[in-house]
Swiss-Prot record:
Gene transcribed to yield this protein: atpB
HAMAP family: ATP_synth_a_bact (MF_01393)
Source organism of this protein record: Helicobacter acinonychis (strain Sheeba)
Name this protein carries in UniProt: ATP synthase subunit a
Assembly, per entry: F-type ATPases have 2 components, CF(1) - the catalytic core - and CF(0) - the membrane proton channel. CF(1) has five subunits: alpha(3), beta(3), gamma(1), delta(1), epsilon(1). CF(0) has three main subunits: a(1), b(2) and c(9-12). The alpha and beta chains form an alternating ring which encloses part of the gamma chain. CF(1) is attached to CF(0) by a central stalk formed by the gamma and epsilon chains, while a peripheral stalk is formed by the delta and b chains.
GO terms (BP aspect): proton motive force-driven plasma membrane ATP synthesis
Transmembrane segments: 18-38, 76-96, 105-125, 134-154, 179-199, 201-221
Length: 226
């Protein structure tokens, strides 16, 4: 990509895909190391990183149980929690000058959206059975089924677009906002913009996690879904 903003990955290659992949891997390594540090020497009375992580887990489960129930919230936490944490770290790494958010690349957010899309359909089919699961797409009124079924199919595929573009658009916009602020005031650290981007990064990770649980609830809760 021409006129790309310089990042630390440019020391190795200027290829767009390489740069995105570099920060995807770097974010994963950082998340793993920080999570490892939080889980080592676990204490009955949590302190430091352990306390932060336990607070995050409790907050996620508290919100998720209102969507899908406590049992299923815990069951699907490994997926939803990991995605939320990874999206958060991906968003935060872009705040650092000369670093780039993996979530500022649509190809990466598309992969995340596809993971959620295929997984919740897999779970819906596994829990309800193939025919019963897709029968819900036709709606309760039989004569409307020929109209409702294709509408539902389009609706589900549109979730891929909405999930990926929402995250990509917000983070890309945040990165451009930060770049402009740094160009305008290069000798003064723009504290306010950094704080705005920090909270926006948390918000986008939260939204992605919530939508993951919402889609799973719609797929596996036979009494309340669809």
């Amino acid at each position: 990509m021409e006129h790309r903003v310089f990042t630390v990955a440019n020391f190795f290659s200027s290829n767009h895909d390489f740069i995105t992949g570099f920060f995807v891997v770097l974010t994963a390594v950082l998340m793993f190391l920080i999570s490892l540090g939080a889980s080592r020497k676990m204490q009955m009375v949590p302190m430091g990183l352990q306390n932060v992580y336990e607070s995050i887990i409790s907050a996620i489960l508290s919100v998720a149980k209102d969507i899908i129930g406590e049992e299923l919230a815990r069951k699907y936490f490994p997926l939803a929690g990991t995605i939320a944490l990874y999206v958060f770290f991906s968003n935060m790494i872009g705040i650092i000058p000369s670093f780039e958010s993996p979530t500022a690349s649509w190809s990466f957010t598309l992969v995340l959206a596809l993971i959620v899309f295929f997984y919740y359909h897999f779970e819906g089919i596994r829990v309800q059975g193939f025919f019963k699961y897709f029968a819900h797409f036709a709606g309760p009124v039989k004569w409307l089924a020929p109209f409702m079924f294709p509408i539902e199919i389009i609706s589900h595929f549109s979730r891929i677009v909405s999930l990926s573009f929402r995250l990509f658009g917000n983070i890309k916009g945040d990165d451009m906002f930060l770049l402009i602020m740094l160009l305008l005031v290069p000798w003064v650290i723009p504290v306010a913009p950094f704080m705005v981007l920090f909270f926006m990064g948390i918000l986008q990770a939260f939204v992605f996690m919530i939508l993951t649980y919402v889609y799973l609830a719609g797929a596996v809760l036979t009494d309340e879904g669809h």
